[in-house]
Amino acid sequence: MERRKVTIRYFLESKGKRRIAMITAYDYPTARLVDEAGVDGILVGDSLGMVVLGYESTIPVTLTDMLIHVAAVARAKPKALLVADMPFMTYETGPRDALKNASKLIRAGAEAVKPEGGLEIVRIVERLTKAGIPVMGHIGLNPQRVLTLGGFRMMGRTEEQRRKILEDAKALEEAGAFALVIEFVPAGLAREVTESVKIPTICIGAGPYCDGQILVLHDVIGLSEKPPSFAKRYADVASIIRNAVSNYVNEVKESKFPSPEYYKE
């Protein structure tokens, strides 16, 4: 039986009832495959800067980059909910710019957008949600702030950080966010956040107590050069690709390819 389209309502109704599984995808073929695998949500993440484009952080990723990849994923017509990251400096400059840029992502095929931050972006989230653009929040570690943080560090270890993250969660919920990604915080804190809000929480590197989980596809399938410590590798696709291409190269060098079944005289 063909599965139904996953909606914002599905996410909201999942709170405390069923686990939500999300993963990233950045192009048509992988979007099709992960959707066939049954994920509930696909995130076109600005992580594409690191795992696809070769940058050392997500900061160089532009809105143009995101629009190209969102459109590619949308062409797969996934049953999963399609969420798009808002890249660095496409929303921090104010609600007006955020609305303009978020609307471009929606027109490209996204069904929700995800800016990073808490209290400091509440006005932006309010503006987007009032305009009818669904927003998934992102608290804890904000990779777009790696320069300020001095690296990708676990957040929420100090009492001040803990209070801030709890306040961020409530503020984003009140601003209209339909879900929250909680990244790289202690599991106990993620549990506190999950129990303090009525919207679903999605953990990445934050333990088992959220309403769902998300990982970067390239980490899951073994394509990442330096996966984070919290990412589980479920396959070694890098070896499969390397071996396949090596076999192809060898057959070309040895004049074994193309063999008769692959051409006509």
Swiss-Prot record:
- Asked if the Swiss-Prot or TrEMBL record annotates the protein with the keyword Ribonucleoprotein, the reply is no
Residues binding 3-methyl-2-oxobutanoate: D46, S47, D85, K114
Q: Which Pfam families match?
A: Pantoate_transf
Q: Does the keyword Transferase apply?
A: yes
InterPro entries noted in UniProt: Pantoate_hydroxy_MeTrfase, Pyrv/PenolPyrv_kinase-like_dom, Pyrv_kinase-like_dom_sf
Cofactor detail note: Binds 1 Mg(2+) ion per subunit.
* Domain of life (superkingdom): Archaea
Instruction: State a GO cellular component annotated for this protein.
Output: cytoplasm
Q: Which residues bind Mg(2+)?
A: D46, D85, E116
As cofactor, the record names:
Mg(2+)
Q: In which pathway does it act?
A: Cofactor biosynthesis; coenzyme A biosynthesis
Q: Which cysteines are joined by disulfide bonds?
A: none
Subcellular localization(s) per the UniProt record: Cytoplasm
The record's annotation in HAMAP family points to: PanB
- Subunit note: Homodecamer; pentamer of dimers.
Assigned protein family: Belongs to the PanB family.
Q: What is this protein called?
A: 3-methyl-2-oxobutanoate hydroxymethyltransferase
